[in-house]
From Swiss-Prot:
Protein name: Chymotrypsin BI
GO CC field: extracellular region
Classification lineage: Eukaryota, Metazoa, Ecdysozoa, Arthropoda, Crustacea
Domain of life of the organism encoding this protein: Eukaryota
Signal peptide from the UniProt entry: 1-15
Function text: Serine protease with chymotryptic and collagenolytic activities.
Primary subcellular site in the record, as a coarse category: secreted
Residues in Peptidase S1 domain copies: 46-268
CDD domains hit by this protein: Tryp_SPc
Organism field: Penaeus vannamei
Amino acid sequence: MIGKLSLLLVCVAVASGNPAAGKPWHWKSPKPLVDPRIHVNATPRIVGGVEATPHSWPHQAALFIDDMYFCGGSLISSEWVLTAAHCMDGAGFVEVVLGAHNIRQNEASQVSITSTDFFTHENWNSWLLTNDIALIRLPSPVSLNSNIKTVKLPSSDVSVGTTVTPTGWGRPSDSASGISDVLRQVNVPVMTNADCDSVYGIVGDGVVCIDGTGGKSTCNGDSGGPLNLNGMTYGITSFGSSAGCEKGYPAAFTRVYYYLDWIQQKTGVTP
């Protein structure tokens, strides 16, 4: 049986000045958190990673949803952004910021675009967290440059044990009061779905998990962002443990390879 699911909404007060907002933001992370069924021993430490080199992940999008929620996303064409269904479920509008590194600054590289044209997967299940995938259509194609680029979809699946790199502006530690100013990244290995399912009990074929041993993982605010490898996005940040981001539990991502047909049907984008 699955563990009890709790939805953590972390409210973060943020200074104004970002081109996506003309007023102070109160950002919340809608990342679903699942109670693990087993205990993992881990020494709590910073949730991983380092500040990314500015604009080294030029497909990374920052999503400001309904003036309330913050998520990440991936630019997969000049018109389409890939993100998580739990980010867009019930949303009215989204402000997509591309070309950003420090989301609390007015960087010359940033482009802000508002969209009301988006949809979640038809079979998205917010209780079981299945089909946690969504697409945002930009009202007009964005101009690509060295700071704003598209990311490729994978033509093959990612193997267990492969080191992958999730990126995002999520909380850098469980004790952090808010999300990160700057884009961060962490290198982590892919684990088996069987081992991940033994922890959460809701891990199906459409999910890929990373091993959070040592406290390296995604956290609140990273939702919808990419799982990167060799210029491709293999996953969409989906859910983690309600015990905390630093505790050594796996983090789960929507497996992009599993949804290639769905993405192509909706957008025409192929690997």
